[in-house]
């Protein structure tokens, strides 16, 4: 089986990749927990969803806003675990945030947040064409809905790739 380009990039940067048979997230999580018990490694929570990580991502959002000179009217991103959208909400005051749920169900609520569910499952790829690199099962789905549903032209799209 050919490795995903992101996996190859992780290996290039020194990551040790242990592949397991794919399946439900609970099965993959069990493999990860067993590996950590066996090796003493530390397992990150799904989406690295810690307050420390949210603060780091939020700080990056503030840097982007500073570079833009103002908060955009709309910020769009994909939602997997919810870490990114939670971080954006922490770092902004006025922007309307649009999160496109592409995988796990996101249950967070905020007055400035609108969550749109992508109509196809995580494993189904978006066929939308963007003029920048984007993951077709993740960010590209959010960009597709951003282009279709944005309410203004003052939009920031956060592409994780």
Give the ranges of each region predicted by the language model.
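Structural motif
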Residues: 43-45, 76-78, 156-158
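Short internal beta-strands
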Residues: 1-2, 19-20, 98-104
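Phosphate-binding loop/pocket of nucleotide- and phosphate-handling active sites
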Residues: 150-161
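Glycine-rich phosphate/pyrophosphate-binding loop at beta-loop-alpha junctions
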Residues: 54-118
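Active-site/ligand-binding loops adjacent to catalytic centers
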Residues: 94-150
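A short acidic, amphipathic alpha-helical/loop segment
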Residues: 6, 31, 87-91, 145-148
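Small/polar-residue-rich loop-to-helix segments that shape phosphate-bearing ligand pockets
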Residues: 2-70, 110-133
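A short acidic Gly-Thr/Ser loop motif
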Residues: 78-83, 139, 160-161
């Amino acid at each position: 089986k050919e490795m995903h380009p992101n996996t190859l990039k992780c290996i290039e940067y020194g990551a040790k990749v242990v592949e397991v048979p794919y399946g439900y997230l609970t099965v993959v999580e069990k493999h990860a927990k067993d590996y950590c018990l066996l090796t003493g490694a530390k397992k990150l929570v799904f989406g690295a969803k810690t307050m420390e990580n949210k603060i780091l991502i939020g700080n990056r959002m503030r840097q982007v806003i500073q570079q833009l000179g103002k908060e955009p009217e709309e910020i769009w991103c994909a939602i997997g675990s919810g870490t990114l959208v939670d971080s954006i909400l922490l770092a902004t005051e006025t922007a309307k945030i649009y999160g496109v749920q592409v995988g796990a169900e996101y249950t967070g609520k905020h007055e400035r947040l609108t969550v749109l569910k992508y109509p196809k499952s995580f494993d189904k790829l978006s066929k939308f064409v963007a003029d920048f690199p984007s993951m077709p099962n993740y960010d590209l789905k959010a960009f597709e809905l951003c282009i279709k549903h944005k309410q203004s032209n003052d939009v920031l799209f956060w592409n994780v790739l």
